């Protein structure tokens, strides 16, 4: 079987793609890790997954990791301690992404799937220009597009899994509060159920990219599972777990970058014009999850 090399395979996005590739069974996944001795790497090895060591700051290690791969799923992490807060603008993330593109080009990768985000500075016409973890990915995307490497772009929203992975719900005596910085009750959020939908979208692109009629190469695909106001989400969770869940709007997160991100999402919206579910991905066979399905599968077992 052809090989797809997956970066971030021990994180939220890469693991979603890895699991979907394994379930699909048409490609052999190769996971990339900075350490083969980490618990996450050992868990993948125990499952029979090939895990190779590479560092996004080391182009030669990236070339070795990609050697013989038909495809790659690429993602970078602004919050990586090697990137931030050493540099508040996280320019190292751009270096990492460009290194990955260069390595993919050198190794003749036939299909590069990049996990990106819209450029906040450009789409807000300069109103929000400090959301570096968003803009950096868009800058890398531009570099990929100019590189000549055959590619497609996957765009994600707010991770629905943040509800439990980042502790968005706070326990109270009677239930939970759902505090969100910068968001008002009427503001809409666009969210991605990463573990359910991102991998499915990646596999759909991977399975169809060689067919010109599908229009995949060079295209962008927002992977938006659901849209909601936070009071709507809180109400749905409350009904499912039979406990009080109250949304509260916070004036700040304590970090300018995060405040600008949430205000940008709330006031302008990364995906205001993207229908849910994305018809381009539905046409490729992606079956998106719904907010209700996400709550039943991921929230109820943890909070009921």
Model region roles, listed by residue range:
Residues 44-58:
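Rossmann-fold cofactor-recognition segment
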Residues 213-216, 241, 249-304:
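A hydrophobic C-terminal alpha-helical subdomain
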Residues 51-54, 243-250:
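Short hydrophobic/aromatic-enriched beta-strand-loop microsegments
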Residues 2-42, 57-60, 64-67, 74-95, ...:
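Oxidoreductase cofactor-interface core, primarily capturing Rossmann-like NAD(P)-dependent enzymes
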Residues 1-2, 304:
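Universal eukaryotic N-terminal targeting presequences
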């Amino acid at each position: 079987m052809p090989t797809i090399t997956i970066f971030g395979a021990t994180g939220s996005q890469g693991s979603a793609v890895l699991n979907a590739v394994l379930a699909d069974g048409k490609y052999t996944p190769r996971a990339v890790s900075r350490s083969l001795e980490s618990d996450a790497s050992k868990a993948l090895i125990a499952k029979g997954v090939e895990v190779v060591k590479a560092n996004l700051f080391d182009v030669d290690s990236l070339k070795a990791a990609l050697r013989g791969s038909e495809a790659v799923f690429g993602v970078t992490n602004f919050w990586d301690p090697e990137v931030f807060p050493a540099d508040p603008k996280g320019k190292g993330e751009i270096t990492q992404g460009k290194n990955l593109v260069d390595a993919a080009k050198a190794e003749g990768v036939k299909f590069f799937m990049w996990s990106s985000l819209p450029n906040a500075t450009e789409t807000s016409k300069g109103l929000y220009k400090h959301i570096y973890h968003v803009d950096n990915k868009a800058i890398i995307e531009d570099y990929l597009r100019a590189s000549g490497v055959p590619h497609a772009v996957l765009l994600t929203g707010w991770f629905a899994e943040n509800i439990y992975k980042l502790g968005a719900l706070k326990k109270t005596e009677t239930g939970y509060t759902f505090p969100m910085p910068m968001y008002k009750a009427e503001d809409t959020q666009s969210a991605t159920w990463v573990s359910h939908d991102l991998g499915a979208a990646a596999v759909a692109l991977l399975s169809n990219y060689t067919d010109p009629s599908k229009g995949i190469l060079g295209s962008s695909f927002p992977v938006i599972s659901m849209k909601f106001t936070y009071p709507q989400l809180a109400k749905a969770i409350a009904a499912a777990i039979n406990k009080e869940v109250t949304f509260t709007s916070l004036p700040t997160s304590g970090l300018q970058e995060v405040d600008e991100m949430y205000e940008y999402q709330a006031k302008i919206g990364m995906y205001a014009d993207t229908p849910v579910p994305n018809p381009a991905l539905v046409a490729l066979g992606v079956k998106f999850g719904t907010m209700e399905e996400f709550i039943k599968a991921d929230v109820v077992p943890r909070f009921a």
